[in-house]
């Protein structure tokens, strides 16, 4: 290693890769002063060199051959920004086994194979850091691992997908319906051409798996996380929520309960007074609770070229400091506990239920009898003025109930002739 230069390689030169290159170049002098040496990008792995060459002054940095990176002893840090499971997994494992440190922003990979990658880093006495894999530019992985390490963490929850938060903000503030807000998000570049991963909660689910694993020191993988999206939310639901002093947000929730970990993503009604209710547009926020710190919230841009690059470069600098101090690879995977992850039907929540029923005497009594049969306590029943074709619209708010019991009650309601339609079911955050 040159005393004044540590060399790195970028895998991928898309939005985030370009951002990382820009940050390292633009802040070169200041960063050198901060950490005592320069970080230099020696190689950039791309699929299409001709296309990538248009985005960089020195095209000699570009390569389409992994061997030029893995076999170069001068390259000490590999920055993986390719996305996807393979070949990213193979590249990262081979880099770690070759004694190279790795920074990754790959939530898809880490949510499934994070344990394997961290163990490989520990075995080879190198670092594997992934701050940018969750919530872009918001520092949350490092605080959970370091600043909050003295806490028993009980809850990590938040808004961790900017696309869906933008859509719900437009629906709330401008009365848009879902499809119109999605079209606007696509037009402005917040939503991908195929928005499924965002609007169905899959993107947020991967982040919840990572957050839960780090916060609770127990392995949670993506398949453990229940996911539900926002496509069924209507402006009417948002209006009724507002009448009750609540907002609808797509929340990623992880709780460390006495009988296991709860991990899920779904739309939820939260009090308008809750700090997360004020997080709008494409911003993200993560709210944590620990036995010592109590409540804390981290807020900022959850995606984008430079916010995500900020987190990646922060990890690079941490590794450089460790290299200079000779203390790399000290801690591997911290999932030393074996806490079971609960099935969604065994979680407990309150529920908002909107349905259309026959407009006649006795229907509400029938409903409450069915709820009572399955131990579903009703906090509130509101019959709305809306009446169409002999039907009345009813809103029900339950107390906390086991989800499996609630689902069984709902199925019985669906089979009643007096219940014409169950329009919406949304979980309610809080007591």
Predicted features, each with a name:
Residues 316-431:
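A conserved regulatory-domain signal marking ACT and ACT-like small-molecule sensing domains
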